[in-house]
Amino acid sequence: MKRDEFHTEKYYESYNIFGAHIVTEDEMRGVRFTVWAPHAKAMSVVGDFNEWDYEQHKMLQVTEEGIWSLFIPHIEEREIYKYAIETMAGDVIFKADPYAVYAEVRPNTASVVFDIKGYEWNDKNWSRKKKKKSVYKEAMTVYELHFGSWKKKEDGTLYSYKEMAEELIPYVVEHQFTHIEIMPLVEHPYDRSWGYQGTGYYAATSRFGTPHDLMHFVDECHKYGIGVILDWVPGHFCKDAHGLYLFDGTPTYEYKDKDVQENPVWGTVNFDLGKREVRNFLISNALFWMRYFHIDGFRVDAVANMLYWNKEGQEQSNEHAVSFLRELNEAVFAENEDFLMTAEDSTAWPLVTAPTYEGGLGFNYKWNMGWMNDVLKYMECAPEYRKYIHDKMTFSLLYAYSENFILPLSHDEVVHGKKSLLNKMPGDYWDKFAQLRLLYGYFFTHPGKKLLFMGGEFGQFDEWKDLEDLDWNLHDFEMHRYMHDYFKELIALYKRSKPLWQLDHSPEGFQWIDANNNEQSIFSFIRQGDKQEDALVVVCNFTKATYENYKVGVPDFEYYNEILNSDAEQYGGSGQVNKKRLKAIQEPYHNQAAHVEITIPPFGVSILRPVKTRKGSKKQDGSKTKVRSNVTSRGKR
């Protein structure tokens, strides 16, 4: 690296220069320490090796813009250290290394010398398989989890990365999730920030073990066909004294202007995304996790907070952030075109998942926060009043193809007094389970990839408690076992049913049969795959009423079978199912060529699959009928 390159040009391997590197110089083994502190008056390295005396190992300033460096011989791996920084005000402050790849276990805050290289990976088969598939036309089910509270040992201590590989991976495989999404694993001082208020961006948190232990965990995930997505927070960081905040006594990584520096809601500060050094720090960090940890994707947190300045009373876009996100995504996809870059964005910013060359931000997925908010508000409403907010369940289809969406039932909605998904459902005990089964049925049949927070799969009753583990004892109760069985059957059905994912991002993959039955709160629609015979009919009843001989318009197949009914007794339902083959009556209904008469279960979802291939019904011009949505697509990535 040229001396000025880090300050003026795109340099995405800054972790190779900065931090603590075990090297041999002048035939002496030791550690080369390099750090950026543009307004420091003097710098030194301190640790047990010099009894934390900042007068002993003074660093040399190697660029006018504030790069400092020093080689210290005879220091070995696992040595703890910090930088002692003399500020322009004459104070001496002690800081952890921004580029450290390992740190002490909290509450201690020193950095640790660690050789990040040397792990032998065994995931070449995983990499080859990924390249053969297009994620856009594949099933995608993401299990979101918090590493520290998924499961704990009997004595309350945390499972390590290696132990989690043994505990978590078989569970994820059993449930047929395609990916896990882990809440932030960068080093962070405060457990209850869940990792979102980090400061050690290059250090996998030592709460669970070493960086090599985390590599082992990812390697094992890949061995069993599970992708690993990490929550990543490039927008803001914590203000703890040992971290990035006021690193050299002045705003270094954060904005100088207090109006845009502070995040009063979170108690954090925003990265100055207009600085080349900060961009290089963050984009290098993303590539570092990709290269060293073989991560398969990032869920980029709080994109809305990045896109807009947080000045009170203003909604002005932050052009630094817009430019940064485009640069970030270009760098990531240049590194790995099969990577997942998901934006957690609640705004209406256009073209989030469009390529940068089309004027987009360059992500390939976006959380559909609007769908999540609308659907949960609808489900929390008393069933008899749902007819008055009917549009909350249909509105999402007006924009479902404007972006590549993931439907999130995430941690944000089951904490801070919002209740668990199960407990959001109104009514008595039976009603709650029936409606959660219904919600999941709608979730898995609506266009978009899927994400569920841990515990939802068996109907966690209490909201998420981040200092405890999940209520695994609920499996002792029959209704929770029924829920768990239902969820596993539903996800298995989803994965083997091409209509439910093959055209997720194309309007040809969805068609309303009846979106207007607000009086009965019944919705029916078709999901379509690439082939005409790959079609499913879905009927959802959001009230407790049961309907016999209910007419539903269907595509022109001769017979239909009900392949899933959430009211089946084996799932804890009342047993209002359609056991017999359903003959399609050749009379048009709901703008379809034929219809079937079925039993609609209470708080139930019924999924029908055609038995025989389409008979070849013709339009007047002689062409075959094609199932089609009336929504216009934005276009594929």
Curated annotation (Swiss-Prot):
Catalyzes the formation of the alpha-1,6-glucosidic linkages in glycogen by scission of a 1,4-alpha-linked oligosaccharide from growing alpha-1,4-glucan chains and the subsequent attachment of the oligosaccharide to the alpha-1,6 position. HAMAP family: GlgB. Monomer. Pfam families: Alpha-amylase (PF00128), Alpha-amylase_C (PF02806), CBM_48 (PF02922). Coiled coil: none annotated. Residues 611-637 are annotated as: Disordered. Residues 628-637 have a biased composition (Polar residues). PANTHER family: 1,4-ALPHA-GLUCAN-BRANCHING ENZYME. It is an enzyme of class 2 (transferase). Belongs to the glycosyl hydrolase 13 family. GlgB subfamily. GO terms for cellular component: cytosol. The keyword Transport does not apply. The gene is glgB. It catalyses: Transfers a segment of a (1->4)-alpha-D-glucan chain to a primary hydroxy group in a similar glucan chain. This is 1,4-alpha-glucan branching enzyme GlgB. Gene3D superfamilies: Glycosidases, Golgi alpha-mannosidase II, Immunoglobulins. GO terms for molecular function: 1,4-alpha-glucan branching enzyme activity; cation binding; hydrolase activity, hydrolyzing O-glycosyl compounds. InterPro entries: A-amylase/branching_C, Branching_enzy, GlgB, GlgB_N_E_set_prok, Glyco_hydro_13_cat_dom, Glyco_hydro_13_N, Glyco_hydro_b, Glycoside_hydrolase_SF. One of its GO terms (biological process) is glycogen biosynthetic process. Its EC number is 2.4.1.18. The active site is at D301 (nucleophile), E344 (proton donor). The keyword Flavoprotein does not apply. Keywords: Carbohydrate metabolism, Glycogen biosynthesis, Glycogen metabolism, Glycosyltransferase, Transferase.
